[in-house]
Amino acid sequence: MTAKEIRDSFKSFFESKGHQIVPSAPMVIKDDPTLMFTNAGMNQFKDIILGNHPAKYKRVADSQKCLRVSGKHNDLEEVGHDTYHHTMFEMLGNWSFGDYFKKEAIGWAWEYLVDVLKIDPKDLYATVFEGSPEEGLERDNEAASYWEQFLPKDHILNGNKHDNFWEMGDTGPCGPCSEIHIDSRSEEEKAQIPGNQLVNKDHPQVIEIWNLVFMQFNRKADGSLEGLPAKVIDTGMGFERLVRTLQGKTSNYDTDVFQPILKAIAEMAGTTYGQDNQKDIAMRVIADHIRTIAFSITDGQLPSNAKAGYVIRRILRRAVRYGYTFLGQKQAFMYKLLPVLIENMGEAYPELNAQKTLIEKVIKEEEESFLRTLETGIRLLDKTMNDAKAAGKKEISGVDAFTLYDTFGFPLDLTELILRENGMTVNEEEFNAEMQKQKERARNAAAVETGDWITIKEGDTHFVGYDFTEYETSILRYRQIKQKNQTLYQIVLSDTPFYAESGGQVGDTGVIVSEFETIEIIDTKKENNLPIHITKKLPEHLDVPMMACVDTEKRAACAANHSCTHLLDEALRQVLGTHVEQKGSLVTPESLRFDFSHFQKVTDEQLREVEHLVNAKIRENIPLTEYRNLPIEKAKELGAIALFGEKYGDEVRVVQFGNSIEFCGGTHVPATGKIGMVRIISESSVAAGVRRIEAITGAKVEELMDTVQDTLNDLKALFNNAPDLKVAIRKYIDENAGLKKQVEEFMKEKGAALKARLVENAKEINGVKVVKAIIPMSADVVKDIAFQLKGEIPANLFVVIGSVDNNKPMLTVMISEDLVKAGQNAGKLVREAAKLIQGGGGGQPHFATAGGKNPDGLNAAVDKVIELAAL
């Protein structure tokens, strides 16, 4: 079976068992503060599992694209070194929300593997939770009894809490699980060692392929367990491992999931996969990482230096580094693999082809940028090695190696490889200590203590913010969080007009008011689609009616800026072309930011045209047309624009202002006239193929215009209220340029005369012409004089000049090449003498400069240079 046939067979099987087949959620997560990426199939169902929302379907199945770069078996630096771990992978899964449980989950897993896929039963093993006395948990005898209907007892193994008790996090739903393992060894190997001795022993041919999680508990903040009201089945099967098993391969990379990409890489590198272990590792790294990078960009995450973007950049750079080091790829190459990836996976994930141009451009620019950084890093490593050799050492410090890692993306193994080639080593203990310090810093910065939810009353949350900014409500539950030595409280309300941060729009602020007190809401966030109201103070009376009141001034400003982004999007399409797609946005009360796909700088003329179009739509005062709970197919028929990387349900909200029609959950003005006016204040590049416009609206435009007018008035006053300010400024610039030229010519004449005087006054010491002086000249003039002197006296010349410019002392030393060969070094001399002017400096052996703070020490510094030179 091909990979496509296997994926389709899984969906068909569970569809026949009454499961709703749902599309994969985006790999990039936007509304869960605990995760950056989808790392399991259950992520998109977290709200249901946590009880925040009811399940639309009781039974669900899908194939989910996932990304893991940490955790059990997922150290990024190990990917590529074995044949079955990946960063990006597909997870086949089926779920039950309060419907079937262990019996059906185990029975259907067996039916699919054995009856549909025809896997030999004697090669299968199942693990069950052995229990935990300290938790008061018994062995999962229920699961074991169901497995005994299919497997002999020696194929049913007990597993410890680490392997067979699944937990969502430190708190939340959890429960025992059953792993299904398959033994793919030869019959001879099986005869020598039984498979049950190799389960969970990291044997490359005895691997886990499916995990059946039976969620039946909730882990509280104090570590105790309580039963879940509705039990959940959550299963996940590694697609790549399953394909490998069914295609009879010993490596995931030998399957049709990876082979087309590996062949393309080998062709680029002029090699063959399977002939050289180090090259094979490099090719596996690249084949794995190109999938991760392409899907991440498709789902809206560009490489960057922060958070999720940094993870993607790190993965991309790791792949480039392997290509550079082991496959001779000194130019950008990964972007050329995209057509092969699309041909291989584009049918299952059409968004890849839809975003092809953007993905290629982003990857290519990132590669080229890192290759430049790599060259810089190599030069720095060369200098570090030379300094160590000069000091008689064969080891560089771990601190230097960590700087290379942290600043230039040099993993330790690349540094070690280059050092080995030069007969040197690195202090790994120091490097590891620096790495540990960085991890501690990151851990402390991100540390959050989250308490249990305290329930005041049962119920669901209803958002009423599209229609109301004040609404009567009550507190359903709350919890305490501690972060960065600050205690905050998160509150869930029964009904809320507060918009929770999402879709680029910041969350509402305001107050909740009862007859006893007023509590300030400092922010509103969304956690798995649940609005969370954040406050510094918990109400003393939690079970009384309250009024939730949004800050209407901030809300109105946000609404104006959000509606403006829609008009801006439409105008950009008109001016630049239909290739323009939104790639991100930020809507605050103060301003708006809009990122979009475009492959060159937007000209000033184009920006002006866009701004005029938007302002024309504002003046038209186009009323808002809003569609709520619209079936997604109907929304598409309307022509509504959806964003790549966003997850939409079966029903959506659509916002329309004339020709601008978009899927959107944000708050908007009732008519475009409420925006007032827009002014674009900047346009810049975010990444390859992605531009950014920043703009302001309404009162902020008035403030800007006032500032501009004030500046204009000040300029007019400076030019005596000249009738034509532009002409007056041009005349001033021209006159200034003329005067500057006169000064330069005067300084040249003065410098020439000074140079002649210096040559005349030069002293000869032991055959060396020594030019020593202190002059009131700028650093540039002194430098010119020094090089002119060298031109006139090419041998046996030693120049030391002290100068003062704007009360800042400067020391300049120039030495002829023959004296340098004899052992003189201007850089070393300057560094030592600069201490006398309270400064520092350096340079090359033949020319160096130093600046300082103490002009009074200049004479002593000049004499010190002569003394140190020992002429």
UniProtKB/Swiss-Prot annotation:
Q: Name one GO biological process term.
A: alanyl-tRNA aminoacylation
Q: Which cofactor does it need?
A: Zn(2+)
A molecular-function term among this protein's GO annotations: zinc ion binding
Q: What is known of its domains?
A: Consists of three domains; the N-terminal catalytic domain, the editing domain and the C-terminal C-Ala domain. The editing domain removes incorrectly charged amino acids, while the C-Ala domain, along with tRNA(Ala), serves as a bridge to cooperatively bring together the editing and aminoacylation centers thus stimulating deacylation of misacylated tRNAs.
Q: What SMART domains does this protein's entry cite?
A: tRNA_SAD (SM00863)
Q: Which gene encodes it?
A: alaS
Q: Which keywords has UniProt assigned to this entry? A: Aminoacyl-tRNA synthetase, ATP-binding, Cytoplasm, Ligase, Metal-binding, Nucleotide-binding, Protein biosynthesis, RNA-binding, tRNA-binding, Zinc
Quote the EC number.
6.1.1.7
- Quote the cellular component terms of the Gene Ontology held in the record: cytoplasm
User: Species name for this entry?
Assistant: Phocaeicola vulgatus (strain ATCC 8482 / DSM 1447 / JCM 5826 / CCUG 4940 / NBRC 14291 / NCTC 11154)
Q: Where in the cell is it found?
A: Cytoplasm
Q: What is this protein called?
A: Alanine--tRNA ligase
PROSITE patterns named in the record: AA_TRNA_LIGASE_II_ALA
Instruction: Assign the protein's first listed, main location to one coarse class.
Output: cytoplasm
